[in-house]
């Protein structure tokens, strides 16, 4: 199905220049999502930390208001998108900075393991480990453990929904709110839109979705 006619006119030029993700060339596609923002916010402090996961360590990025007092702030665990196979916290720096400024909160973004190198359940285990770390390090982070939200987009949205269930089932840290944005939830690829969006230059087409799910689920 031709999707160009359904794109807002002001976005047409950007869309026409985007090559589309090519999951048979992951190095290329991952490169599309690894560019740092042009300018960091002067109102938000960003800190890099390494925390433990099941296989060693992983990166988290902490975003907080510059000049904050020591009052405990609400917090959000942000899970970047990328179809479970791409992405890095750096791609959402601007978005996380906006969350901090809009909600006067602390945002923690986790660099979870990606498929196919690390298929399910690696990514969700990393997200859960980060959530537990936030609870355990609440004093250092200056956050209120009773006001911790989780959120993510695309594959990160799917992990957000999964994390809410995992935390519930494990009796883990309490979550006050979840925000899965256009989440990647259904591996069956039977919906009408799955058959409609097939063009190679589409941002995320049927072939990409099937390929990414196969990479993520592995032998599961």
Language-model-detected regions and their locations in the chain:
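A glycine/proline-hinged amphipathic helix-loop "lid/cap" segment
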Residues: 1-65
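Short beta-strand element of the alpha/beta-hydrolase
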Residues: 72-82
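Alpha/beta-hydrolase active-site loop
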Residues: 118-140
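Short amphipathic alpha-helix adjacent to the substrate-entry channel of hydrolases
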Residues: 90-110
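Gly/Ala-rich beta-loop-alpha elbow adjacent to hydrolase catalytic centers
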Residues: 152, 156, 160
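Hydrolase active-site cap/lid region
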Residues: 165, 169-220
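Short beta-strand immediately N-terminal to the catalytic nucleophile in serine-hydrolase-like folds
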Residues: 150-152, 181
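Gly/Ser-rich "nucleophile elbow"/oxyanion-hole loop immediately N-terminal to the catalytic nucleophile
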Residues: 135-150, 170
């Amino acid at each position: 199905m031709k999707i160009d006619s359904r794109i807002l006119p002001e976005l047409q030029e950007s869309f026409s220049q985007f090559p589309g993700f090519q999951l048979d060339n992951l190095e290329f596609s991952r490169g599309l999502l690894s560019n740092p923002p042009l300018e960091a916010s002067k109102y938000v402090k960003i800190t890099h930390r390494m925390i433990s996961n099941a296989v060693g360590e992983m990166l988290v990025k902490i975003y907080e208001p510059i000049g904050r007092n020591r009052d405990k702030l609400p917090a959000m665990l942000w899970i970047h998108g990328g179809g479970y196979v791409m992405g890095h916290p750096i791609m959402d720096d601007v978005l996380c900075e906006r969350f901090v400024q809009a909600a006067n909160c602390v945002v923690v973004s986790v660099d979870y393991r990606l498929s196919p190198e690390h298929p399910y359940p690696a990514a969700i285990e990393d997200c859960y480990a980060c959530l537990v770390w936030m609870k355990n390090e609440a004093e250092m982070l200056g956050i209120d453990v009773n006001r911790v939200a989780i959120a993510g987009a695309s594959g990160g949205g799917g992990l957000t929904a999964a994390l809410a269930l995992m935390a519930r089932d494990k009796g883990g840290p309490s979550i006050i709110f979840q925000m899965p944005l256009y989440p990647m939830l259904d591996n069956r690829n039977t919906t009408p839109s799955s058959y409609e969006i097939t063009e190679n230059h589409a941002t995320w087409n049927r072939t990409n979705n099937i390929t990414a799910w196969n990479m993520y689920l592995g032998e599961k």
